[in-house]
Structure formats: C-alpha cells, structure tokens
C-alpha cells in the first residue's frame, strides 16, 4: 500500500507525482521502511478493540431503544406520629389575615411595665396570696400580757447619786467573785453598770460554808475586829468570808492587774 501525495514540486514543477513514503531515494533498505511503519503503526493500538474490529454485528438481534420513562412527582405523606391529624374545612376555617406593618402594630409594652428601660416581669405574675399563719405551739396560752404600767420616758434620778456610783443590783447567785481592775489600778471603768466584776469589796460574794469552810485557816484577829485568813496547803477558797479583811483577801487571792499578752503579737 502506498500513499501518493502532491508535493511542492507537483504544484510548481511540471506537476510531478512522487510516492513520498515509498520513494527509493528516501530509504536505503527495506528494513528501514519496515521499522518506520512498525514504530508508527504498532499492534498495541488495536489490542483493546480487536474483538470489535473482526466481529460482524449484522446478525445481532435488534434491540429496540425505549424512550425515557415519564417521571411522576413524589407525594410526601405526613407521618401520624410526627404531625397532627388533618382538619376539615369546617373546623379550621381559613381567614384572610393581613399582617400589620411596623407602623400599625400596637405597642405591647405598657408604660407601667417599663421601669427605667427594664421590663418589670413581676406584673405578669398572678397576685400573691397570704399564707395563713399557724400559732406557735411552744408558746403557752396563758392569756394576754398585762398592760405595761410603767410610765414612758426616763425616770427621775435620785438627788446627787448616779447609776454608776450606786452600782448594779444583782441577786446573791449573780454576785461577782473578783474585783475589777479599775479598783486595783484606781482608774475609770468604761463598762460602768454592765461590768461583770465588783467595784467595791462589799459587793463580792461570800462563801456559803462560812466558818465551816475546810480550805482556810484563821491566822489572827486584827484590832478592828476583822479576820486575817490564809489558805490551807493544796487548797484555795475563791470566795470572801465574813469579817475577812480586804488585805487578807488580796493576799490570799492575788488579783491580776495586767491584761494577758497576745502570743501572736511580737
């Protein structure tokens, strides 16, 4: 098989026909021409479609090409567990409602609810009801309290005697057993009548055993008739005894005149 082409010489030089691919002047040997065809027309090109090239399809049965099926729209049905049942026209009558514009909408916030730019939601709650108060079971029902017969206002003070100088009035069970530091230091007590210590020696509580107390020993009797007592070894009586001298009481029970130091402060 040879291919004849029209070269440049054919057009302008006597219309000379040249067998371009099989011209003897182009290839010295036939082996070169065979190599040329093998390189450009190899069998690898026809490997994939070799079966189609050499098979005659004239005897194959006729397959009718059908048109594309008509697509019908899919109807989505609501699930009974997911949506509410449909309502009839009578039960759910549709009314044409025109949505109001922003300039025709009524104000939903009343001026009473708006307090300094903050909505007062407590006005929307139901009114509070007062709970019935139950009587106190611990309190005894002994009747009403008697009216206070004391006159209002400050009572009249005695002539020239203040409450601090007079001293607090205590029962025998509430009498102090120690002297105040202001008496020992000869200073002013800032607590006044509310002080829990005695401001006078006569205000101290006496021993309930008296002469039968087994923790003291009589040392001597002073010229003024007062007694000078002392504690027995291994025993201390913290109370004042009758006719005991003040010096005897202070010697037997030394009073602390200094406040205890705070160990944290240096």
From Swiss-Prot:
One of its GO terms (molecular function) is zinc ion binding. It comes from the Viruses. Keywords: Metal-binding, Zinc, Zinc-finger. Residues 105-119, 160-176 have a biased composition (Polar residues). Residues 84-176 are annotated as: Disordered. The keyword NAD does not apply. The keyword Zinc applies. A zinc finger (C3H1-type) spans 180-192. InterPro entries: Zn_finger_prot (IPR045410), Znf_CCCH (IPR000571), Znf_CCCH_sf (IPR036855). Residues 88-100 have a biased composition (Basic and acidic residues). Belongs to the IIV-6 077L family. This is Putative zinc finger protein 034R. It comes from Invertebrate iridescent virus 3 (IIV-3).
